[in-house]
A protein has these predicted regions:
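N-terminal active-site wall of soluble small-molecule enzyme domains
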Residues: 89, 96-197, 203-208, 234-237
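Catalytic cores of alpha/beta
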Residues: 154-165, 204-212, 253-270
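Conserved, mostly hydrophobic/aromatic
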Residues: 39, 87, 112, 162, ...
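Short, Lys/Arg-enriched N-terminal segments with co-localized hydrophobic residues
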Residues: 16-33
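C-terminal helical cap(s) of enzyme catalytic domains, especially alpha/beta-barrels
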Residues: 237-240, 278-291
């Protein structure tokens, strides 16, 4: 009898511990979502204003006039042997504030291309990153390598818009989309000849990305609660992504040792922003990271 009571108490205690862990997880996620939700809410307001200026039907019509047989150059750039480098053109960020007071974005993009970047990530989010659609359009005219539109996609409108301003890929963030939206937006991007970089922060979001049919999964190493970065997040979550799915590590890579650690773990590409943006010699900085 005593043994039975002990077993029951142990079982109940274990369940309570599991419940506590789940509550801690949900509380932490809510803190992170608050930041993303604020930016996403701003994006929704931006889309509403954009629709007034150019209706969705017109945005769709313009996108469908473009050739959808693109060959998905962004995906091809990441699928090549060895580590691929997505270099970011970014003026500011919520975590670091103003990064580049002087922001010669076209010149930066040209430097990245000359340095051997495989693709360029261009921030177009205006409220928190001081980005503009025009940055991407002008960079598109100046370089030949693929461009990722780095923004907070909250509406199908933004996917058609991305195609029309010259992007080769869009960012889809699991934390601000429902599973249905993620699946739908991934499909729309594919129909337009755009690649979708589906961003996850944890195990649940990786599973969500895979369920939506993502062919490129990116893991953000930044903790959105306190803005610290830990590339072990990518090392840990890489194991959940099948080898036939391209894997991108985002944020926090500062040294050749960081890159080597990710190479050993089967990472296909890294997205690097601040480290390169703060470098006076971007070609030398990228060469050092490549090793």
């Amino acid at each position: 009898m005593h043994d039975k009571v002990s077993r029951v108490l142990l079982t109940c205690g274990a369940r309570i511990l599991d419940l506590d862990r789940n509550l801690d997880y949900e509380t932490e996620r809510q803190d992170e979502w608050m930041i993303l939700d604020t930016i996403a809410a701003s994006a929704k307001e931006r889309v509403a204003a954009a629709k007034e200026a150019l209706p969705l039907t017109e945005q769709i019509a313009r996108a469908r006039e473009l050739d959808s047989n693109t060959g998905f150059p962004f995906e091809q750039a990441l699928a090549k042997p060895g580590m691929s480098f997505i270099c970011e053109a970014k003026k500011a960020s919520p975590s670091k504030g103003l990064i580049a007071p002087e922001f010669p974005y076209v010149q930066i993009a040209k430097e990245y291309e000359a340095a051997g970047a495989d693709a360029i990530s261009v921030l177009t989010e205006p409220a928190y990153f001081q980005g503009k659609n025009e940055y991407l359009t002008e960079i598109r005219q100046a370089v030949k390598i693929p461009l990722l539109r780095k923004d907070f996609t909250v509406d199908e409108y933004m996917i058609y818009e991305a195609r029309n301003i010259g992007a080769d890929a869009v960012l889809l963030i699991c934390a601000i989309l429902s599973p249905m939206q993620l699946s739908e937006y991934t499909g729309i991007a594919g129909e337009l000849g755009l690649s979708a970089l589906v961003e996850a922060h944890d195990e649940r979001e990786v599973e969500m990305a895979l369920a939506a049919g993502a062919s490129i999964v990116g893991v953000n190493n930044r903790n959105l609660k306190d803005f610290t970065v830990d590339i072990h997040n990518s090392v840990r979550l890489r194991e959940l992504v099948p080898e036939n799915i391209l894997f991108v590590s985002e944020s926090g890579m500062k040294t050749r040792q960081d890159i080597a650690r990710l190479e050993q773990n089967g990472t296909n590409a890294v997205l690097i922003g601040e480290t390169l943006m703060r470098s006076a010699d971007k070609k030398a900085a990228l060469r050092e990271l490549r090793g």
